[in-house]
Structure formats: C-alpha cells, structure tokens
Amino acid sequence: MLVDGKGGITTIPGLNQIQLEGFCRFIDQGLMEELSKFQKIEDIDQEIEFQLFVETYQLVEPLIKERDAVYDSLTYSSELYVSAGLIRKASKDMQEQTIFIGSLPIMNSLGTFIVNGIYRIVINQILQSPGIYYRSELDQNGISVYTGTIISDWGGRLELEIDRKARVWARVSRKQKISILVLLSAMGLNLREILENVCYPEILLSFLRDKEKKKIGSKENAILEFYKKFACVGGDPLFSESLCKELQNKFFQQRCELGRIGRRNMNRRLHLDIPHNNTFLLPRDILEATDHLIGLKFGMGTLDDMNHLQNKRIRSVADLLQDQFGLALVRLENAVQGTLCGAIRHKRIPTPQNLVTSTLLTTTYESFFGLHPLSQVLDGTNPLTQIVHARKVSSLGPGGLTGRTASFRIRDIHPSHYGRICPIDTSEGINVGLIGSLAIHVRIGNWGSLESPFYEISDRLTGVRVLHLSPGRDEYYMVAAGNSLALNQDIQEDQVVPARYRQEFLTIAWEQVNLRSIFPFQYFSIGASLIPFIEHNDANRALMSSNMQRQAVPLTWSEKCIVGTGMERQAALDSGSLAIAEREGRVIYTDTEKILVSGDGKTINIPLVMYQRSNKNTCMYQQPQVRRGQFIKKGQILAGGAATVEGELALGKSVLVAYMPWEGYNFEDAVLISECLVYEDIFTSFHIKKYEIQIHMTTQGPEKVTNEIPHLEAHLIRNLDKNGIVLQGSWVEPGDVLVGKLTPQVVKESAYAPEDRLLRAILGIPVSASKETCLKVPIGARGRVIDVRWIQKKGGYGYNPEKIRVYILQKREIKVGDKVAGRHGNKGIISKILPRQDMPYLQDGRSVDLVFNPLGVPSRMNVGQIFECSLGLAGSLLDRHYRIAPFDERYEQEASRKIVFSELYEASKQTANPWAFEPEYPGKSRIFDGRTGKTFEHPVLIGKPYILKLIHQVDDKIHGRSIGHYALVTQQPLRGRAKQGGQRVGEMEVWALEGFGVAHILQEMLTYKSDHIRARQEVLGTTIVGGTIPSPKNAPESFRLLVRELRSLALELTHFLVSEKNFQVNRKEA
C-alpha cells in the first residue's frame, strides 16, 4: 500500500478484477454491439418484416441463488428480454412485443460461472494481434528472404514474399503463390492505378511479361487466375457472378477481416490514416505493405519481433462471450427466417413471440461452457488455487498454438513480459511457457494489450503520478530497477542506479531516470509473490513452489506462516473464502449457518458456507469471528474460511524440521515424520466425496428406490431409511448401501441352469423380476454422511432422469505415501512414521517433527528454504511474525543473512536458549539421537519452515487387482486405477527381475498374470481342483500379435531346428 501525491492510497488491484471487468464490458458493450448487427428479416414476398429494437434489452435478476444452483445442478443465469416488432408493409401496422431470447450465464463475485451445478472459469487467451508483421528467413542457399504476413482477426494469413530477383508474390497457402499484381487486379485496381500508388513502380514493371499482362488485363482475368490458385481443384473455370461471390466470401471476408484492433495496428505499422470502422483489408493496405517489403529488401525499414507483447492481444472473457452471443444471433436469424416463411406458407398469423425460440441462445452457451478448451472446471483445491486459475493466460485454444508444435522461442521469457506476465509461474510439462500467469498489477487495456503501472519521475511534478503503459511504450523511457524498488517513497536514491531501456539493462545516473516501478512484487504472479526469499532460489524451484502451493489441502487447524511476504492477506481477501461486512452495524445473531447484522434500520442476513465440497473434493467452510452484540465496520472480517487465519492465507503448518540423513529413510527426497503429527492432527484434513446414482425409466418400467433389497446381508442396508436412502449422519464402510435401487427386468425360465430351476421348484422361490443396482460405498472409502439430495431437473431439453447424491465427509490423517512440500520447491513423500521417542531431539528436549534430506538443497539451489527455516525458528522462540519483501539486497549486501542471524542471536539471548545461535556454526545446533541419547557427530540445521500437505494422497492412489478386465487385442490387463487395471511390468522391471534370477516369478508375470489365455484358464482350474500349475506350452498373445503385425508388412516369422546335438566349446587356458 503506497501513498500517492494527492494524499490518496494506492492499493493492489483486486485479483479478480480482470475477470469482473471483462464480464461487465460484455454486458455493457458486447450485447449492444451484437444485437445491433441483427438484420431485418423479411418473408419471400417482402410483405412482413421482423426486427429487434436493441435499445430496450433488459436482463432479469437470477431466479435462484448460487448455492441452490450448485446443489440442484442448475445454471446460474439471467433471462434476456428484447423488444421485437413485426411490420406488415401493406397496412403499415407494427406489432411490438417483449420477447424472451434465452438465458445468459452470469458471473458471480469471484469471477466464476455456475453451469449445470459446476463452477467453471473462462481463462484469458493471448493471441498474435491482427495486423502485418515483417520478418527475414534464410533460404537453402543462405540468402535472406523477406516476408510480410498479414494476420486477420480470425487467424487467417496472407503472406507477401519478395524473392532474389525482387519479385513480389502473394502466398495464398503454403504451396500456392501468385503475383502481387494479380492480387491487386483481383481487388479492383488496374495496372495504371497500381503503378501510380507505389514508391517502386520500376521494380513491379521489371518482371511484367506478356503472360502476366494477359492475367491482369482485366479484373475478370485476374479473378479467374486467383481462383485457379486459391480454390479450383481441376478444370478451367469461367468467370461468373457466383465465382466472384465465392471468392469474396472464402478469401476476402475470412482471411482479410482485420477487425478493430487489426485496423489500428495496420495504420500504425504502415503509417496510414484509414478510419477504424473500415475493418477489411483494402488495396491501399496491400500497396503500402508491398512498398515496405521492397524497402526491407534494400535495407530500409525494421523487422518485427513476433514474440513481443506489443504484437500480442488478450482475448478476454468479454470477447469469448460476445463471439458466442453473435453465433447464437446468427442461428436465431436463420430460425426466424424459416419460421416466418413457414407461417406465411401455411397461412398462419405470426407474432414476434411465436417466431423466436429461446433454446438457441441457451444451448449455444451450454455448448461453449461444456466444450470450449478455454472454459475449464474451476480448480478449487484451496482459496489460492481459485485466484490463480482466474489469472491464467493461455496461448492454446482456437486460433492459438498447440503444445506439440510450439517452438522453444515462443515458450521463452521475453523482455516485454517484465511487469505483465510472471517470468516464473507457468505450467510444467508439454505446456511449459504456453500457459502463464498475469502479474499482480497488470490490467487489460482497451485494445487488448497488457498494461503495467509505473511512477513518473519528473522535477515538474510535486507528487507521484502513476502511468499505465502498454508493451512497447515503456521501451522509450529509462525505467529504474534494482535498488530503486524501495517501499519507502522518501528514501534517498543512490547516484547511480540500474535501469531498463529498449530491452537492455544499463547503469545510469538517477537524474536520467524517467519511470520507476511501484511495487517489489510488480513482476510476479500471486503464486510467486507468496514465496519468501524467492531471490535466493533457482527459478525452476520457484516455479515448482508456485504450482505446489495451488495443490495444498486446507487443514483442520490451519496456522499462518511465521515468515511471509505480506501478500497473504490480499490473497485471502480476494479469494472469496472470507465473509466481509458490506456496511457497518451491530451483530444481532450468529451461528454456524448465518450472521445477522442490523444497521440503518435494516437487517442483513449473511449466509455462511458449511461443509461445501469443492471440485477437488476438499472441504470448504466458514467460521464466525464476531460475537453477538459486537459493533462492526464496513470491510471488517465477519467469518474466516478454510485455509485462512486472522484474515491471512494459511495453507500449511510451521513444524520443527531437521536437515540430516536418518538411516536412509529420507533418501531421494523421502521424508521422515514423527507420530505426533498424526496423533495431534497437525496435518489432518477433511475431504468430501460425492456419490451419485440416476433413476431411469426403462422399457420394463421405472426403477424403484427401496430399502427392501433381496439377497443382501442385513448389515449392508442397516443405514437406509424407509425410502431406501442412507440416513444423514450415518457412518458408512466399504460395501455399505447408500441408495437401494431395483431395476425391473424380464427373465425367462430357460435362462437359468437346470439344477437352478430344480432348486427353485423345490423351495418355491419365484423368478426375480428385478435386478439389484444399488449405490454402494466403493472399496477404500469410508466416512460420515453429511448430506443427501434428491434432484429432479425441471424443464430443460431432452430426457432428465432423477438423481440422488450422497455426500460423505472423510477425515484423513497424514500417512506413509502422502506428499508434503515447502514453499521453495522442496517436496517429498512420507517414507516412515517414527515414534516420538525415536526422533532426534533438541537441547531443550523437544523432538523434531520432520526430517529432510540435506542433499536436496545444494543441487536444487533453493537456498531460500534455509533462510526461512532459521528465521522461522527465531520467530517461534520470540513469538514474532515476519513479512519479508523480495530482493532485500537492494538495501545492503547480505541483508537476508544479517536479519536471520540477528533474529537468531536475539532469540538466544531473550529466551535463554543459547543453542539457538552458536557462533561456531551459526544456524546449526547439536542435537541428540532419540534412540541412543548420544549427540550426532556434526551439528545439524534445525528450524521451523512452513510445510504444506498436498492433494496427492496415498488414499487416492493405492490400488490392488486380483481379477479384472483384459484388453481385447493384446489380452493384457487394462491400465489405470479407475478400470481396475494391472501393474505394468516394463522392460526395466524385467531387467531387475532377471538380475535377481527369479525365473519363475518372471515367467508368471509374462504369461499367467498377463496375456497367455490358455495358461490363465489352466491356472484357474488347477487352483480350484488342486495340483501343480502346468507350464505354458505355447506363445503368449502379445507375441502372436507381433507375428500378425509382421505378416501385415509381408514378413513371415518362422522357426526351424538347426541340430538335435548339443554343442560344447572347450576353453583352454592360455
């Protein structure tokens, strides 16, 4: 928070602000723009005209609440009404009605949508901005070839190329190219107009031969030639109006529509003054582009950097929703046209309401949110995850790049990203560099560019002025960096400071500085700005830390970090997990479900979240932090949320850690923990699983929900009520029935075996007319039933069966196989849980909670964890919390080391713990082995870092298979836990078994347990009857499959006997 020159306060912008501003822009401008494009519709005889009056559209407040939409699997939407008129030209009568066009999904206050009960987010897309770009490439002979690429608003491309002989070509596709003169002639210019409006007419005339003159002799000839290259597959086309119209639709409208942004970029690059409302490519654009291309050939002009952010644009949620709304209106226009003509044909009297159907807009948006790659299910693991997901920017998607074809240069960090896109936070894997995260202070400008704020430094200004500069504009200023990033405005700057100018870093005098950054975290995303001492970490480890903080599970008893960065409060406030007072008043009632506040003669009901399931099965809740009768102010926190403490983000716990090896149990990033973390619920978390079953209407009748399930043991249905649904509050174990359901079926008597029919006749058991299809608790799941919902979707389109959902709350303690991590990319798997008495203990008798491997620090170069570890120990002894801004070396050298050692020294003096700081080995201490009581040979680094429990838990991953399905082709077990698949024995696993000489185990894994069909059947029979398992006598199915594939390549694999004799080689000693 900084004070500006006018006495006001400059705060960090809302982290959801970009999403909210985009949706508001769509509601205020996008709807009007698309509705104004709706054409007047007439019948065939042009007697009746239909039109929309776009000035009077209105959106109705949603009829349901957000929480009800989630539980009932509905869409949180608003109904759109527009005035429409039907004019009869003969009598000049107009019938005007307000019609319902459809439902529009509405964004909530967190920047998300609720579609069919699921929280979804529309992320921003970064694309190449429409316009013209010049670049140079080397051909096979090492000669530079200059090209100019015109990119349309929809991603279509038209390339202009100049070869070694200075001939200019227009490349329509990758293979076909035509002369630039043919293109200009097809656009309506004759040769004289072309030569009069270019700067180099002699170059264009130099390659004009008789054959070329014939092609451009008339517009018709040019269009025919252009059509041959562009669309004609075979034959000799003749000029016609349909051919001209087809070329106009296919090429000039699809590939040459620049749009508003493209027209602006074209005017700026080619120094044109064409009006911005003229959004199509004009002959004048081609002429100027050709002149510039020829100038580049002779050393004049500059090339473009395609990866510079000034050549990129952001396609926000407003653009995506507006495109879908325009698509829905086009479909509506066609539907109204067909309905109107049908009504006139059948001599019915149409009305505006009868002509318009509301399903088109609704289904268009349902398809967009369900299928579009930029519409994603909200990652709700913790509050931070929701914010980071909304601030992602992706180069993938329609019109963008793909993970397999994007080059390294596109993925790399560009200097123009400075202050706009975080250089650290990106995806790992194939999408690295293609999915980034926006910096904290960035905003989206009117032209789709990313703007970053700077302070203007001038002697004329008495105060501080903030400028938001788009990419490219800040390159013309000297931007101070490094030690000029002081938080205090009044600090005296040095005489010489590092600065950035034209993508280069310089050292200049302070008097030459034009701009300065406004905040130390200005260049990072919210995830990276939560890492203390980030300047001491390798960038790869900082990237891992940013991603792993999003995977942290909210704990039962959260704890705010001892060492932080100061951004924790902002992240918690903008995440929506806190309940904030909207006005001042007095609390008159509070419980776990709601808070009632009275003020200004009104009573406000603030509902609280209680055991709400996120999309990642984590438990979200809110706890009141105010008392009855307490007076509150506007903006005060009323209730804390999951993973928040005192209004700050709290994702983990500060535990006592030692960096030392321990009997090999922390080898290769494994982690050793104490049993007190389990018994004291230090890393215990709650998870909510949702189980769903549908009730269908079958051909034999409806399915029945009942508690009378035949052939099931009584203890499995003990928790069902009279309706056959599990009671809320019941404790369920694997195999218990949650919903009892019977499906009717027709079973013939002949379907049973003879002995079964005889037994039924003797005992008098009737043939069952239904089949048990109950919803049961799966293997490995247990917990408490916290909610049961019976959902019937009313209305809608198509068949909507009834659904019954059961929510089960699970309590998970930390166990062997769970994953934990710090905030510096240091992650590991729990390998062993030791008794408290066996853990190493300190000189004051406290046992260590967690043991990390010290070898994980030097090679990974994430030294920031050492600073956090030691400073956390000092903070726990002194009962202090630290908020450290990054790059504190701007104040003095070794600033981080000095503050850590000074705090440790103070802790050792004030708390009577001299072991906290020992001058011989500062930061380390002598600790004792809990098993023997002896001291370890070397001093060990101990401290209290902030440790997170990640969502990668062993309960979700452990899997076993006894029987299961096999693949049809290879006859091998399927892959994956969801399919009850088997464990793959690959090449390296076979080598390991061979190394130990376990021949029988290896044979079983490659034959009986895998794809030997006959041997599998023999093993089953032998197991039932008893006896020795026979050895397989023929080849397994995978070998037979290999033989068949070789035969498909005309290769026959055969075998033959060389000799029946045994050959022995006698080796003689040398």
From Swiss-Prot:
PROSITE patterns noted in UniProt: RNA_POL_BETA
Taxonomy, superkingdom: Eukaryota
Gene Ontology annotations of biological process type: DNA-templated transcription
Gene3D superfamilies, sorted: 2.40.50.100, 2.40.50.150, 3.90.1100.10, DNA-directed RNA polymerase, beta subunit, external 1 domain, DNA-directed RNA polymerase, subunit 2, domain 6, RNA polymerase alpha subunit dimerisation domain, RNA polymerase Rpb2, domain 2
Catalytic activity: RNA(n) + a ribonucleoside 5'-triphosphate = RNA(n+1) + diphosphate
Alphabetical keyword list: DNA-directed RNA polymerase, Nucleotidyltransferase, Plastid, Transcription, Transferase
SUPFAM superfamilies in the record: beta and beta-prime subunits of DNA dependent RNA-polymerase (SSF64484)
Compartment annotation: Plastid
Main location: plastid
Matching Pfam families: RNA_pol_Rpb2_1, RNA_pol_Rpb2_2, RNA_pol_Rpb2_3, RNA_pol_Rpb2_6, RNA_pol_Rpb2_7
Top enzyme class: transferase
Alphabetical list of InterPro entries matching this protein: DNA-dir_RNA_pol_bsu_ext_1_sf, DNA-dir_RNA_pol_su2, DNA-dir_RNAP_su2_dom, DNA-dir_RNAP_su2_hyb_sf, RNA_pol_bsu_bac, RNA_pol_bsu_CS, RNA_pol_bsu_protrusion, RNA_pol_Rpb2_2
CDD domains noted in UniProt: RNA_pol_B_RPB2 (cd00653)
Similarity section: Belongs to the RNA polymerase beta chain family.
Subunit and interaction comment: In plastids the minimal PEP RNA polymerase catalytic core is composed of four subunits: alpha, beta, beta', and beta''. When a (nuclear-encoded) sigma factor is associated with the core the holoenzyme is formed, which can initiate transcription.
PANTHER family, alphabetized: DNA-DIRECTED RNA POLYMERASE I SUBUNIT 2 (PTHR20856)
Protein name: DNA-directed RNA polymerase subunit beta
Organism of this sequence: Cuscuta reflexa
Taxon lineage: Eukaryota, Viridiplantae, Streptophyta, Embryophyta, Tracheophyta
Gene field: rpoB
